[in-house]
Amino acid sequence: MFDTHCHLRFPDYEPLGGATKVLDRATEAGVRGAITIATTVEDARRSADLAESDDRLWHTAGVHPLYSDDSGALDELKAIAERPKCVAFGEMGLDQHYAKPNQDIQIASLEGQLERISRWRKDGLAKPIVIHCRKATADLIPRLNDSGLPADQFVFHCFTGTPDEARAVLDFGAWISFTGVVTFQNAPEVARAASLVPNDRIMAETDAPFMTPAPHRNIKPNEPKFVVHVCEALAKIRGCTPQAMEELLDTNAERFFGITLPDSPRAF
């Protein structure tokens, strides 16, 4: 297994021994690696340092919409994205669940990042893009489309929308990634959405320290080791074995992010 999206620099992990100990527990569970996702420019810089210290870890470079009022140094993302363990830009996008930062600030941050990514791509710095979308599908997809960037280079992480919203993302041409929400009994629409995604455009993640999956929902913080439960849930929803689901998810992660996972024991 592989956790395509977590936040190992968050202070939640300090009482647990830090990122290395968290990754050790993931390895014991058959999770072969993870991507620690940036939320600010400084977080991206420190995430790069962390990833370069552990063969099981990669990182991204981007500004989260809920931190978009701190977007004054977007040009600095280029140097971070050029570092050897950076596999994507992001996470970036729109979040309409919270009132702050307001939508104008979020949009300015998103469009500023997309404009730079498009320009850097023409200069040879081409990486996929991790998208945060919360209650904003109808507003976000047109902005991504207007960027001119290839639709298949976007992944909508932590999908919590409806089947119709999943179809909109798929019609646009992007990928969809699922968290422990697919294990929640009170989220049947997310499970139905997960059944719709083609084999070649689905991924799994924890979004740790958030979204701990069943049967461990009361455990905080969430950890990359629990991505195995996301895999099991997706296998059940999609009518295949956990082994087949793990192989598919690992292959997709390697293909989308351009990485080779460590040759270590699998979860299933």
Identify the function of each model-found stretch.
Residues 1-268:
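Mid-domain alpha/beta scaffold segments of enzyme catalytic cores
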